Amino acid sequence: MRELTVRLSFTTNCLGDVKKYVKDAGNKRWPVYFMPRMPNGGKIRFQANWWTSSLKYAAKVMNKHLREVNGVSFEVAVDGRTDSNIDHFYKRHFKGNGDESKFVKHEAFFPGDIIGINCVVPGSISDDDFWTLMDYVGRFRGISPYSPTEGYGRFEVVTIRETPARHGSKDISRR
């Protein structure tokens, strides 16, 4: 097992799905969708099971590592920031009653935004194979709190690197 840090660059918008109401200047309430956050309200959170189900799909496409992907564990906190100004949120347009066009705002990662995720990968999956698995996830599934099946959250893999030790050095001296 080894811990890896994966950097991803979004190719389509990745939209938040946590519905909250905000008031405009006229005191009217509007629904706005935010990214899910860690309990302390800080980092953006992507559920580990989103990654797991997408990796299972990628393993089927690759026809390799069908069992081993069950051993991949993802940290739920995402290393990435969005623009917190609601005026800059993504506008998702849809048809209202009749032919009128409406929109709702989503906090989002936009194409070109880069995030980092940490995961633990079994030794039986090589770095090259893990890259290929993540590439399939990014091109065909995506990762987005709001409707990845509608094409949101597609990405390209930028880098995969071993995560530096967090608790001291690998060269530990004992007395």
Residue ranges and their predicted role:
Residues 1-175:
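RNA-interacting cores
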